[in-house]
Amino acid sequence: MSQGQPRRPQQPAGQGENQEPIKYGDVFNVSGELANKPIAPQDAAMMQTAETQVLGQTQKGGTAAVMQAAATRNEQVGVVGHNDITDIAGEQGVTLAETDVAGRRIITEAVAGQVVGQYVQATPVMTSQVGVVLQNAITIGEALEATAKTAGDKPVDQSDAAAVQAAEVRATGSNVIIPGGLAATAQSAAAHNATLDRDEEKIKLNQVLTGATAKLPADKAVTRQDAEGVVSAELRNNPNVATHPGGVAASMAAAARLNENVNA
């Protein structure tokens, strides 16, 4: 199993010296209102329940464990109570979604709609009559299709379009943008969205990337170099110089890590 690891909260240097709460933004790549909220005990409890229901147990060093450690520390210094729940988490919920892509199970954890953790598991593989394990590497097209499910509701912006273009170039081996292809569609979507104010009216990633494999004229297994190229493109075109959790770059990076494990 591979996992996008959250940052484990640091213990204060001395007992009672640091009374500042550990906030979501301190340990997860989140933004907006959620980033400034302290992690509360009941938030962690909800994530533990979700992991147990879907994965059979909470994951060692995983999202629920990190949330529990942060919540325990916040309770110890008196900034939250044992039964407290963060208002935005209580209103919008904690979710754990499963997506099956090319024999892999992608598990995405979110708080208030923002991704805080992602796991990739290999599902049981087929074996041939002579007992050889057959396990195919994840392709660029499949990684893009995974993005349509893990971040499908995200409006397409210039960083997404740049990442999709970099992925298409890696898949086809050509720098020529294919008319009507994924990169061209993503660029058009980003340009269109830039003229709109309401997210509800904007073109979303799932509208561009669903069925990505069939839309690519060529495809290949994701390598670390492919992922690095896509990550670089997304970073360069994001004003905050950050990749989107569960987005194109994140899915490519997860696919590359899994492919390296398969080939190890």
Swiss-Prot record:
Residues 1-16 have a biased composition (Low complexity). Residues 22-76, 138-194, 203-261 form the SMP domain. It comes from the Eukaryota. It holds the Pfam family SMP. Disulfide bonds: none annotated. Keywords: Repeat. Residues 1-23 are annotated as: Disordered. LEA proteins are late embryonic proteins abundant in higher plant seed embryos. There are two subsets of LEA proteins (5a and 5b), the first ones are expressed when the cotyledon weight reach 80 mg and the second set are expressed above 100 mg. The function of those proteins is not known. Belongs to the LEA type SMP family. This is a SET 5b protein. This is Late embryogenesis abundant protein D-34. It comes from Gossypium hirsutum. The lineage of its organism: Eukaryota, Viridiplantae, Streptophyta, Embryophyta, Tracheophyta.
